[in-house]
Structure formats: structure tokens, C-alpha cells
């Protein structure tokens, strides 16, 4: 398995920022009761529950922010990897800033649903693959959806070279529900708190292996990351180019306006 694949179950998927959205953003994300339900459903697996508030170093902050990792939750992960790897992944996207179709460099993407759709990048439409074409993954998706009693969408990221590719620091503005399923090579996953555009507290780092599932509570998704005055979480993954935090004296804070000019590398 040469590449790293992450398939994200969520209420709203997209092939790239600014491209067509599939589904609608939920009003609420995953709370502790839902996290507990998943823990109980996978009680025969190794469970890691990370309270990310401990990395803020602020004892007065008490908003629920838990990352759940279920190790080797998907036992037939190699079969699913082979099912996914040879699909035609999107390597192009429509850039809103430059108003034209560009090549994807940091990763490739693909959305999944109950139908097939050919890409039309000029009109901001990415490729969609029908679940019937990936029956082994579909079984795992349905298992999770049945546990939660939800009909979730699916969005995939493909990293062909984890030493050169990744995704920069960001929050998931388009959704409140995130369940990541990893296939292929292990890859890093980082979280850090921010306030007023500045990183604060301690960075949390882990590796997500093939067959692992990770689940973000609502706060952990970073859906509120554009609200500068709040304590918010951002995450990143991949090589150092995308995961390094440049914290230097007198350096201009990493604000949303700065990030928007580099959206090509972030998303």
C-alpha cells in the first residue's frame, strides 16, 4: 500500500473549497452521548479518547472537545484500499480566487454517493462515485451509519506521497460531523488551539493507521475557526510543509485573510 487514503463520513461533502456541496450542513455535531455510543459499539477494539482541552493549558475552559480513535476498527482495510486506489480521483478543481481550473498538488479528492457523476470543473462540479462500485467500503459505512442512525455523505482524500503532500492548518467550515476512515500508509494528524489568529497551548500529534477510525466532536472539527476571538481548534496532516507552526517573535499572526490567499494548498 503506497498511498494514504482518508474517507470522511460527514453530513456535507465537497471535492474542494468552493466546489459543489453534496448534502447540507447540520445544526449540531457529535456530542459526548454519540461518542459514547460509538465506543460501546466498538468495545472489542482498542479505544483512545483524547480530551483536547488539556492541550489548551487553561483550566477554566470547559467546552467539550474530544477526539475518539478506534484502532483497527476496519479489519478488511487492505481489501478496501485495493477497492479505492484505482478509482479515478479528482486531480483538478475550480479555483475561486483565480477563477479558473487548476491542478491539485497537495492531494487528490473524490466524493461518494448513491449515484455517479462525471466532473465538470468549470462549473465547480467534481467527480462522484456510486457506493455500489465500492461494496466493501459501503458495508463499513452502513455499519457506522446504522450505529448512529444517520445517513452520512462521504468525501475522500488521496495522498500519493506522504513525504511531500498533506493538508495545512484549518477547520472544517462546511460541516460539523467528521468520522475519518484511514486506508493505506499511516499518516500523521495534528491539532492545535488558536485564539486571535495565534496558536496557543500545546500541539497534539498522533498517527492514524490503515483500518483506524477517528471521530471529532463538534468543537474538534474547528467549524468555528474563523471566529478569531474564540478559542478554536485547527488540524493538519501530512509532511512538515503542511503541519509546521511557524511561531516567531514579531511574526504576523496566521489570520483567516492570509489563509484565503493560500486556499490552493490548504484544501
Q: Where do the protein language model's features map onto the residues?
A:
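Non-heme Fe(II) oxygenase metal-center motifs and adjacent flexible, charged/small-residue loops
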Residues: 1-267
